[in-house]
Amino acid sequence: MKLLFELSGEHPDLPAAELECVGTVLDRRTQVAVAECPDPEAVGRLALTHVVMEYLGECEPSKEGLTGLLRDLAIRTEKPFAGRVKLIQGAHMDAARLEVEKLIGGLIAGPVSLRDPVEEYRAVVSDDRCYFGRVIARIDRGGFEFRNPMRRPFFHPGVMMPRMGRALVNISLVRPGELIFDPFCGTGGILLEAREIGVRVLGSDFDPVMVAGYRQNLPGSDVMIADATAVPVCDGALDSVVTDLPYGQSVRIHGESMDRLYDGSLAEIRRILKPGRRAVVVTHRDITPIAARHFTILQEHEQRVHKSLTRRILVLG
């Protein structure tokens, strides 16, 4: 099924990269993407998307262009519906938003209900294109807020927020029922997001305090105290690895140097990851020369967290 995605503006690239877990991206504009998705219900796992629509068509961003598209579509519905318009980051049409919404309502055969619609038809204008679709899902962000690290039984500062953790799990392309591993699991934030979408999880950390905290946050999930450069896991046993590599003075590190730790842990990830599968690694400085010794670098992203912290995200295969 061809779907239209209205993406979050939290990052210029990560929302579109995340879509690979549900389909093949066919077209992309600012905060908008079109993808072919074999299972539309899978979109519920996404973290960096706002609205998902059945793709109905596209046109130039003008009243005339949308009129022609709607006449060609000749949509009929018995359900009460509303027409909405979304202008992305300064995009514009040659008519006011309310006028365009009225146009949509007038060219779809069916009962209009702005207060209590059962269906919503949405025109999304981005850059030089107007996309049109029927809303089939809105991503519930309340669940992510409910899993805020401050709400967990065990809290440790500096942990990744749930939406970003989920996005990284999705970018790894792991599927429900498969096994994901985090060799620097800390209090379990990344694996908590993986478990929420039906993925089997395994964590390890060298710090017994973090492992104890993990057990509080993810009761019943497998975790072990282990050196990330020598993990007691068989070769090619894992479907996915997602991890936030340690940094700074606030973490307990086993190894002669940070570079040695990174090199050893990436070599170990390579060993235990199934051939053809992905690892997603977050760092806080450039380690591409180290990563390139063990993997092909498929994607690189940067995310500014605050003035003194920029995350570097490597997708490895």
Question: Can you annotate each of these PLM segments?
Answer:
Residues 1-53, 61, 65, 69, ...:
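Class I S-adenosyl-L-methionine-dependent methyltransferase catalytic core
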Residues 74-108, 112-117, 121-130:
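A short N-terminal interaction module
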